[in-house]
Amino acid sequence: MKVRSSVKKICDKCRVIRRKGRVMIICAQPKHKQRQG
């Protein structure tokens, strides 16, 4: 899980979701998991 100020889709399997007011990226590739901190 990468914590970044700006989250971007890395590949076309990345999905932008919102959980508890946080913007997160979930993907089939675990390396691409990010959340906004």
Curated annotation (Swiss-Prot):
<dbReference type="Pfam" id="PF00444">
    <property type="entry name" value="Ribosomal_L36"/>
</dbReference>
<dbReference type="GO" id="GO:0005840">
    <property type="term" value="C:ribosome"/>
</dbReference>
<dbReference type="InterPro" id="IPR035977">
    <property type="entry name" value="Ribosomal_bL36_sp"/>
</dbReference>
<dbReference type="GO" id="GO:0006412">
    <property type="term" value="P:translation"/>
</dbReference>
<dbReference type="GO" id="GO:0005737">
    <property type="term" value="C:cytoplasm"/>
</dbReference>
<dbReference type="InterPro" id="IPR000473">
    <property type="entry name" value="Ribosomal_bL36"/>
</dbReference>
<comment type="similarity">
    <text>Belongs to the bacterial ribosomal protein bL36 family.</text>
</comment>
<keyword id="KW-0687">Ribonucleoprotein</keyword>
<keyword id="KW-0689">Ribosomal protein</keyword>
<dbReference type="GO" id="GO:0003735">
    <property type="term" value="F:structural constituent of ribosome"/>
</dbReference>
<protein>
    <recommendedName>
        <fullName>Large ribosomal subunit protein bL36</fullName>
    </recommendedName>
</protein>
<dbReference type="GO" id="GO:1990904">
    <property type="term" value="C:ribonucleoprotein complex"/>
</dbReference>
